[in-house]
Amino acid sequence: MATPHIAANPGDFADTVLMPGDPLRAKHIAETYLANPVLVNDVRGMLGYTGEYRGRMLSVMGSGMGVPSISIYAHELFTQFNVKNIVRIGSCGSIRDEVKVRDIVIGMGAGTDSLVNRVRLNHYDFAAIADYDLLEPVVNAARRREARFHVGALFTTDLFYAADPGLTERLSAHGVKAVEMEAAGLYGVAAECGGKALALCTVSDHLLSGERLSPEERRTSFNDMVEIALEAAVGF
């Protein structure tokens, strides 16, 4: 049954959905990696596809940018379309010297400056963590590919243009690997809805050195992350 944001029918989505932020990246992933991809959503240009990968039905759909956007789509996928697993595949900005541009950060947990999870729990803190059943297969897939990856904490921010110049230093001192804009919200929705979620992000920008990928480099560098997610998802 269609929702306000997803015009799909029951059964249109697979158990596992990969979610890049950019709907055009979802289209690229579906057309590049999935056999017989079918467009299952295009409301507001948020493209979603379902197809086959190595004998397993998988879906890929854009999430948009930020906690509110991914929260809407994740909630509807979990509660209305019987999706079991959502894997965010996106970009992040490194705040650690050892986490280089093009490296992959697998978000075991995510802090945030957003209040969404506190609102869920009457303003108490919430431990926004990934599901281990997704985390372990992704780590194993990254190891098999001999990818450069790091497992640890992300920081999810509502502000792309940071208002607190000292925050990066404080986060880094607490071991946070990178900054992005969705993971903590996704983990909160998954917990609320009884689903499983994981975020893995390719470092597109280094917030300490200023190094960043060009648009073309982003496209090619992100392929490693996508292929790791696909390989792992077959075994979920």
UniProtKB/Swiss-Prot annotation:
One matching Pfam family: PNP_UDP_1
Molecular function per GO: purine-nucleoside phosphorylase activity
Sequence positions that bind phosphate: 21, 25, 44, 88-91
Keywords, comma-separated and alphabetical: Glycosyltransferase, Transferase
Keyword Transferase tagged: yes
Catalytic reactions on record: a purine D-ribonucleoside + phosphate = a purine nucleobase + alpha-D-ribose 1-phosphate; a purine 2'-deoxy-D-ribonucleoside + phosphate = a purine nucleobase + 2-deoxy-alpha-D-ribose 1-phosphate
Gene3D superfamilies registered for this protein in UniProt: Nucleoside phosphorylase domain
Sites annotated Important for catalytic activity: 218
Binding of a purine D-ribonucleoside, residues: 5, 180-182, 204-205
This protein's GO CC annotations: cytosol
EC number: 2.4.2.1
Main EC class the enzyme belongs to: transferase
A GO biological-process term: purine nucleoside catabolic process
Family named by the database record: Belongs to the PNP/UDP phosphorylase family.
Subunit structure: Homohexamer; trimer of homodimers.
Classification via HAMAP family: Pur_nucleosid_phosp (MF_01627)
Protein name, per record: Purine nucleoside phosphorylase DeoD-type
Organism, scientific name: Hahella chejuensis (strain KCTC 2396)
